[in-house]
């Protein structure tokens, strides 16, 4: 039995007057479903950093060493490396609704196991399951956004989704220790993380209903599994791509493995309190905690994420207009070095260094990820992004473990901060090599929209001659 012919897609400009305000072809419907698509990963972002946010309490109450905290992040990345090879294929096989629900449930199961765990192995098992679901869910979320916003407000939609997702991380760092102290148990805080994951599952059900309705009314594009690795494409990548990949590994390895134990470092080295002292109910204390974000250890850690939430969409728009992607990656890698060294070898207030890291975390990803389609052929972008994500997770798996082991071995965070500064040096080298390679390949990364448009017009004129 053949499928019925797809109905023509109704755009806002061609929609008949009889179509209602909340019709799937209308902007209000798209942005409402975008809200629920964005909330699919809110729980996973919250739960991912709940371990780092609670690190001092977990170390004290469970008698864990720092390397165990790092290992919990490593377990997540191991699952992420494996699942990146299958996530896109599962999406193609199951479709957007069933795939997103499956991965949301995996995230919930993993977070629940972590919250209920009574041994280290149960903690590791929970993080493995959580990582498998979370990384796949991020891939699926990107594919779903592309499905609904292709040819429309794509860049805006991705910016909104990232900002809403990062709210989970911001809340995790600024509420988890408070929840643990308020209820007298770290386990309640871990259950709060699982509750956020349950909330994402409920949002998934709303998304499923809206997507099903939209699919019945509109001829939505055929689901695309997103970033899938085709091994035959790998040998076709030029040097610029590989420098972007190496820069990606070194840069992210100097950020996320650092934040895994940054809360413990600020509390351990500077004696910065874990929560802001206040009275009243939990909500009242949480508001005070957010107001004094720069004066608590978890709040300082979240400065990087807060900067990304607020400024990343503007940075993306700016870079689209001016170009200079390789140059900005040089600058972003450069500032990592003094920021980490100052926190490692001095007792200066760490807030300025964290603000610098936040600025780097705004600039470099905004320049890095859009560079991939500029240095590889369009048909190989999926392989390029999938491979880059897999290699990135190698660093995100290795360096949290090294961070914890160095702290356990030396008794201070000086060696770990020097390690992160060295990653900044390596990233700076790769950024300069990328800049040189890009110049040899036409300087596409340095071009802004106006220059790209001008070159496109020249090429079109030459083709007509």
Residue ranges and their predicted role:
Residues 161-212:
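Helix-loop-helix hairpin linking two adjacent transmembrane segments in secondary transporters
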Residues 126-164:
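Cytoplasmic helix-loop-helix junction between adjacent transmembrane helices
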Residues 83-95, 311-324:
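Helix-to-loop junctions at the C-terminal end of transmembrane segments
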Residues 82-121:
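Conserved MFS/SLC helix-loop-helix module at the cytosolic interface between two early adjacent transmembrane helices
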């Amino acid at each position: 039995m053949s499928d019925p012919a797809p109905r023509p897609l109704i755009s806002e400009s061609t929609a008949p007057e009889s179509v209602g305000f909340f019709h799937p072809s209308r902007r209000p419907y798209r942005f409402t479903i975008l809200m629920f698509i964005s909330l699919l990963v809110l729980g996973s972002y919250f739960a991912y950093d709940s371990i780092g946010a609670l690190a001092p309490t977990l170390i004290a109450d469970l008698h864990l060493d720092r390397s165990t905290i790092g290992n919990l992040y490593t377990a997540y990345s191991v699952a992420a490396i494996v699942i990146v090879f299958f996530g896109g294929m599962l999406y193609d096989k199951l479709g957007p609704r069933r795939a997103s629900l499956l991965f949301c449930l995996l995230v919930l199961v993993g977070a629940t196991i972590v919250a209920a765990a009574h041994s280290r192995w149960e903690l590791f098992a929970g993080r493995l399951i959580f990582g498998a679901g979370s990384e796949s869910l991020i891939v699926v979320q990107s594919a779903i956004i592309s499905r609904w916003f292709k040819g429309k407000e794509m860049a805006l939609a991705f910016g909104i989704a990232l900002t809403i997702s990062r709210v989970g991380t911001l809340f995790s760092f600024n509420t988890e220790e408070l929840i643990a102290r308020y209820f007298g148990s770290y386990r309640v805080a871990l259950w709060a993380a699982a509750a956020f994951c349950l909330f994402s599952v409920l949002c998934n059900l709303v998304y499923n209903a809206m997507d099903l309705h939209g699919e019945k009314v509109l001829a939505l594009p055929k689901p695309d599994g997103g970033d899938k690795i085709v091994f035959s494409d790998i040998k076709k990548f030029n040097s610029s791509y590989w420098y972007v990949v190496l820069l990606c590994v070194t840069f992210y390895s100097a950020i996320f493995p650092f934040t895994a134990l940054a809360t413990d470092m600020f509390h351990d080295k500077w004696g910065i309190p874990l929560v802001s002292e206040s009275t009243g109910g939990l909500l009242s204390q949480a508001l005070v905690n957010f107001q004094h974000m720069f004066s608590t250890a978890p709040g300082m850690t979240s400065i990087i994420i807060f900067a990304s939430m607020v400024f990343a969409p503007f940075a993306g728009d700016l870079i689209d207009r001016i170009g200079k992607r390789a140059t900005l990656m040089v600058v972003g890698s450069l500032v990592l070095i003094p920021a980490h060294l100052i926190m490692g070898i001095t007792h200066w207030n760490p807030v300025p260094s964290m603000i610098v890291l936040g600025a780097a975390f705004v600039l470099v990803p905004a320049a890095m990820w859009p560079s991939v389609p500029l240095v590889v052929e369009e048909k190989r972008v999926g392989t390029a992004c999938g491979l880059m994500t897999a290699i990135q997770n190698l660093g995100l798996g290795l360096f949290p473990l090294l961070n914890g082991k160095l702290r356990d071995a030396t008794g201070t965070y000086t060696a770990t901060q020097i390690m992160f500064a060295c990653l900044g040096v390596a990233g700076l080298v790769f950024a300069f090599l990328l800049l040189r390679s890009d110049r040899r390949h036409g300087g596409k990364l340095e071009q802004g929209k106006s220059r790209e448009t001008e070159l496109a017009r020249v090429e079109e004129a030459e083709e007509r001659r």
